[in-house]
């Protein structure tokens, strides 16, 4: 999906040609010798699109998501959740059409995971982005997603697709309290054939 390897077969179609992909790894992968602002601008530098407009956009994102006062600090001075927000801003900075998120919260404690899922949801809705996220956390998948795709064990093949519909969709934290949440959670749990 991220074009890191040659595809073996098939194709992926999106509304336009030459889509821009933003890829966020499990770990924040921030460079410790760069300030928060410089880490956020790195993708723009690599793609040679570090314009005044894009720098302004990054500063706007840092301000919007409570990180403006840390932009001249280094990653070591941030919490895990703050570092993940910086990684997400760095990914959004290049104006991707699609965000690929590989277990973006897996390294965080449970409370930070839920709080950051809410932040991610708000950012994605505000920025109007399409997201494809890999997660092993059923609650995270159900509370954040419009569609959940369940894969089989290795080699992974498509097992099931769930269209997640809440009577009234809220933030991931709010969605976890809704009756539909437990229904989807139970269905997906059974689908995964997890035995306790």
Language model features: what each stretch is:
Residues 99-102:
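Catalytic Walker B motif of ABC-type/P-loop ATPase nucleotide-binding domains
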Residues 34-41:
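Short coil-to-helix segment of the ABC ATPase nucleotide-binding domain corresponding to the Q-loop/switch region
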Residues 2:
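Helix-to-loop junction immediately C-terminal to a conserved catalytic motif
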Residues 9-19:
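Conserved ABC transporter NBD signature motif
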Residues 41, 52-70, 122:
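Conserved ABC ATPase "signature" region
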Residues 113-127:
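Helical segment within the ABC ATPase nucleotide-binding domain
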Residues 73-76, 94:
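Conserved signature/switch motifs of ABC ATPase nucleotide-binding domains
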């Amino acid at each position: 999906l991220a074009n890191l390897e040659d595809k073996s077969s098939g194709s992926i179609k999106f509304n336009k040609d030459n889509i821009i992909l933003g890829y966020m790894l499990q770990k924040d992968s921030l460079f410790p010798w760069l300030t928060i602002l410089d880490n956020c601008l790195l993708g723009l530098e690599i793609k040679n699109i570090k314009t005044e407009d894009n720098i302004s956009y990054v500063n706007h994102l840092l301000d919007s998501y409570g990180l403006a006062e840390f932009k001249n600090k280094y990653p070591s001075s941030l919490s895990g959740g703050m570092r993940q927000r910086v990684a997400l801003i760095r990914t959004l900075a290049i104006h991707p059409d699609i965000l690929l998120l590989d277990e973006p919260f897996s390294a965080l404690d449970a409370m930070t995971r839920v709080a950051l899922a809410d932040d991610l949801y708000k950012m994605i809705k505000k920025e109007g982005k399409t997201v494809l996220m890999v997660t092993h956390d059923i609650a995270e998948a159900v509370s954040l997603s419009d569609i959940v795709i369940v894969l089989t064990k290795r080699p992974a093949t498509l097992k099931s697709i769930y269209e997640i519909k809440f009577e009234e969709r809220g933030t991931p934290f709010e969605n976890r309290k809704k009756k539909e949440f437990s229904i989807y959670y139970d269905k997906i749990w059974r689908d995964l054939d997890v035995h306790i």
